A protein has these predicted regions:
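Primarily membrane-embedded glycan-assembly and transfer machineries that use lipid-linked glycans
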Residues: 1-69, 94-211, 279-280
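Short alpha-helical "patches" and their helix-cap loops
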Residues: 5, 76-79, 103-106, 224-232
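Transmembrane alpha-helices and membrane-interface helical segments
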Residues: 13, 17, 57-67, 87-94, ...
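Short, surface-exposed, charge-dense and proline/glycine-enriched linear segments
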Residues: 33, 81, 117-118, 135, ...
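Transmembrane-embedded, aromatic-rich helix segments that form part
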Residues: 71-77, 82-93, 104, 208-210
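Aromatic-enriched
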Residues: 218-286
Length: 286
């Protein structure tokens, strides 16, 4: 019951904090709050007692509060390392090395406490999350890492998994560098949060990470790219699970969703304001 109460607080706090920080109108704030409360990923997080809302809250702190304290607390997102890793990688990609060190404090404190209390080998504990993930074969079917492990026979070998992991991190890092070339913090947060959904295993409740790009798109709904963003996120929030069950063919359905997600990120990057202050996609619906 305690954890349910914490998740309920987060389900209200996250949309209110985002909308207030980036100055969305009261009407849009209420609408987005209702969407976030009623969407399937949020409800699933509450029902199953998952930590997606907890992780998302601490992930977004450095984008909202530009101080050392928020950077330190952002490190708590690493409790779900397949998602929280993006905080650390983004600090490196944006050359915020001081914040990277600060965000590492919670992890190192937890690591010190754990191996001290358990009297276990500190080196083994430090790399244990990655080791367990590789050996136990933690995969899904809607991300690059999982699909490679499913369809490539050599991926069953540990050395191949390590190689793929390294390549994925490099690609993700390059993508983050591209994202961070923009000056709009809200825009950057929206795309950074999508990266874990593209590169590493996740579940349906992790799609709460799409909420920032929905909020960002509500800032200006005149442009085609924002309309596409809104439709895409609402599909994930309300229709994805239903359509998936009706089709019942994950082998094809999940990779297609992944391609759309990748396309969404790339399209948003190149449709952002260019040096002439014009939108690349400025078509409007009348």
């Amino acid at each position: 019951m305690l954890w349910l109460g914490v998740n309920i607080i987060f389900i209200f706090l996250i949309p209110i904090l985002i909308c207030k920080s980036f100055k969305l109108s009261k009407y849009k704030t209420i609408l987005l709050l209702l969407i976030f409360i009623t969407c399937y990923p949020s409800r699933m997080t509450l029902n199953y007692g998952q930590q997606s809302l907890f992780v998302m809250f601490f992930m977004m702190l450095p984008f909202i509060f530009f101080n050392k304290v928020s950077s330190i607390f952002s490190g708590l997102s690493y409790v779900k390392y397949s998602t929280g890793y993006i905080v650390f990688l983004n600090f490196l990609a944006s050359k915020q090395y001081k914040y990277f060190i600060l965000a590492s404090i919670p992890y190192f404190v937890g690591w010190l406490i754990y191996f001290s209390v358990s009297s276990s080998d500190p080196l083994i504990n430090f790399f244990e999350p990655i080791q367990l993930s590789l050996k136990k074969g933690y995969i899904r079917d809607a991300d690059i890492f999982s699909l490679i492990n499913i369809y490539f026979v050599p991926a069953k070998e540990l050395y191949f998994k390590l190689l793929i992991l390294l390549i994925i991190f490099i690609i993700n890092f390059i993508l983050l560098i591209k994202i961070n070339k923009n000056n709009d913090t809200f825009f950057k947060m929206s795309l950074v949060f999508i990266c874990p959904l593209i590169f590493f295993p996740h579940s349906n409740y992790d799609y709460v990470l799409l909420f920032p790009i929905l909020c960002y798109s509500f800032l200006d709904t005149e442009y085609l790219i924002n309309k596409i963003n809104i439709c895409f996120v609402l599909y994930f929030f309300y229709f994805n699970r239903i359509i998936n069950h009706l089709i019942d063919f994950d082998t094809l359905y999940q990779p297609i969703l992944l391609l759309f997600l990748i396309g969404l990120v790339i399209t948003n990057i190149y449709s952002y304001k260019n040096k002439d202050n014009l939108y690349f996609f400025n078509l409007k619906f009348y």
